[in-house]
Amino acid sequence: MGIKFLEVIKPFCAVLPEIQKPERKIQFREKVLWTAITLFIFLVCCQIPLFGIMSSDSADPFYWMRVILASNRGTLMELGISPIVTSGLIMQLLAGAKIIEVGDTPKDRALFNGAQKLFGMIITIGQAIVYVMTGMYGDPSDMGAGICLLIIIQLFVAGLIVLLLDELLQKGYGLGSGISLFIATNICETIVWKAFSPTTVNTGRGTEFEGAIIALFHLLATRTDKVRALREAFYRQNLPNLMNLLATVFVFGVVIYFQGFRVDLPIKSARYRGQYNTYPIKLFYTSNIPIILQSALVSNLYVISQMLSTRFSGNFLVNLLGTWSDTSSGGPARAYPVGGLCYYFSPPESFGSVLDDPIHAAIYICFMLGSCAFFSKTWIEVSGSSAKDVAKQLKEQQMVMRGHRETSMVHELNRYIPTAAAFGGLCIGGLSVMADFLGAIGSGTGILLAVTIIYQYFEIFVKEQSEMGSMGALLF
């Protein structure tokens, strides 16, 4: 059934726009250039407002997810990477449940990736229609059918651009992937902005600067009681404070420390005697994939809940999914869940909130740990990184595990890889929860994604430099 399903959508995949694989080896300088161009296009799209919208000043239902999904409200990047990640989530779940089967051949992998791209485009159109029809840009009846269609087309074209930019980097023209690049850029931009923002906000305490560090100097300069000013800079409410900034730095350090945890399996050449090496299995075996997929799941739950609560407010089943409230304290107007599944799947706002509602905190912790472990373990089956796939790669390189026959390699690898994937996903979820409870800037999930992505780029940079030989020796 699985192969039949992929064969059915094969004709549609053939007409999709595609980036051709490079016919030659792309030099490191060219990769840096293409990566910079990709990032520039993304940042430009983040600043171009959607044409035809009447208003985007209403409470933002996806405020908490925008940093993670690299989206910017009221611009071409309204949807961000959400369609790509959602399509990946759907295809992974279908493959993990064996509803569709992905073979080991390059043809089957290419067909699977094509199906993922097709779903990405369909989801882009679907999300664009939902955003317009739920009144995020104004009442659809007031805007008219023509303007509504124009906004949907703009969002679809922008979504297609994101898909192609991601594919451009994935095919080897640039460094890393578009998804990782866009997420890391968005999160780092948020952290820097909340640390140094010169924007002033009117609070009950008077006019204050949004940026935590600028607020520190402003409070020390304007307040006569310096101790109280210092305390306010560290613990002020509803705006970024120095404790949030210190928590962010602390989480950065903890995640980088855990990145070094790994088990080295001894391997040897089956062809040349005396040639030994190691195969590393990292603690974060699936890297940040679990948290990206978990974010996609929650964001789509938010979309569905918001759409239903707008149309069917007061319905019991709709309220069971999520009830929402608006707030504008300490920043732009935003909607946040106050009941239902969406509430329990959202992080507590602070450590004080944990003490006020421990049941919420307990359910959130269980959800984060369970979903990250599940996504991590199922991802290895569809990404070519399971024990069977690793054994096949080692066999192709004529390498075997020391002390084991070639036929028993899969069994031995199965002792480590699924465990590393599940436990690594569990740790990723745990670190995200810890960062949320500490009040790190950009949410625990966002910080975790930023650190793992930056570390990935560091590893890519080291690898590229080492391949350049003498240049690598000079730099490292």
Swiss-Prot record:
Role noted for this protein: Component of SEC61 channel-forming translocon complex that mediates transport of signal peptide-containing precursor polypeptides across the endoplasmic reticulum (ER). Forms a ribosome receptor and a gated pore in the ER membrane, both functions required for cotranslational translocation of nascent polypeptides.
UniProt xrefs under Pfam families: Plug_translocon, SecY
Family, similarity comment: Belongs to the SecY/SEC61-alpha family.
Membrane topology: Multi-pass membrane protein
Keyword Protein transport assigned: yes
Keyword Ligase appears in the UniProt entry: no
Subunit structure: The SEC61 channel-forming translocon complex consists of channel-forming core components SEC61A1, SEC61B and SEC61G and different auxiliary components such as SEC62 and SEC63.
GO biological process terms, semicolon-separated: protein transport
First-listed, main subcellular location of the protein, grouped into a coarse class: endoplasmic reticulum
GO cellular component: endoplasmic reticulum membrane
Protein name as catalogued: Protein transport protein Sec61 subunit alpha isoform B
Lumenal side: 54-76, 139-144, 194-240, 310-354, 442-445
Protein keywords: Endoplasmic reticulum, Membrane, Protein transport, Translocation, Transmembrane, Transmembrane helix, Transport
Signal peptide start and end residues: none
Tree of life domain: Eukaryota
